[in-house]
Amino acid sequence: MTPTRTRHRHEHRAPVAIAVLVNLGLSLLLPSEVLFFPSWVVPVLGVLLLIPLVVFNPRRLTRETTWSRWVSFSLAILLTVANQLTVVRTIEVLLGGQADGGAVLLTALQVWVSTIIAFGLVYWELDRGGPVARRRPELWTSDEADFQFPQETDPKTATWRPVYLDYLYVAMTNMVAFSPTDTMPMTVRAKMIMAYQALGGFILLALVISRAVNIIS
């Protein structure tokens, strides 16, 4: 998180697009045992939603309309729902103990990474109305902030604005620490989503550790 970002410099499209493509690529590699539908469904839907967003804002996120906002948020919801369905199936496989140990641990790692990417997108879309709205001074200083970053409390970084990688970091630390670290959730919806993510991450990690111990022993 760099303090040199200004409110006037709009966020770059590339990090978000790459994260989405990584998520879609991971879903293609998942075994059928942890999928509710064919492996190509989510990648195809994801690409269909991503293409118009890239065409609309190819380099930086400078424009936003009602339809682009809905498409962008729908993409985040698609990846999150698909990921959580996969988490449920992965937990079932881990509890069943029937699948190959190494393969199921690799699957759990793929699901874990996908969870971080998906929830990072949700936080990114949710906070202060999304990436475009956050560049508007009146929305940034409103009382509707879902997250408070440490840079906001430092007068030296008054013009700093978060980008997707900051929210990705929030999602990652929530999966590892099972609680907020340097960035605090400020609204009920942000707290509930983070609590849900942390709970799912805790269950998944506990089962993975248990399965790994069984394999070693």
Roles of regions detected by a PLM:
Residues 27-40, 59-60:
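Short, hydrophobic transmembrane alpha-helix segments
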Residues 65-77:
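Cytoplasmic-side transmembrane-helix entry/capping segments in multi-pass membrane proteins
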Residues 15, 37-49:
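Structural signature of hydrophobic alpha-helical transmembrane segments
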Residues 49-63:
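Canonical alpha-helical transmembrane segments
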Residues 94-132:
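Pore-domain transmembrane helices of cation channels
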Residues 128-183:
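Membrane-proximal soluble regions of multi-pass membrane proteins
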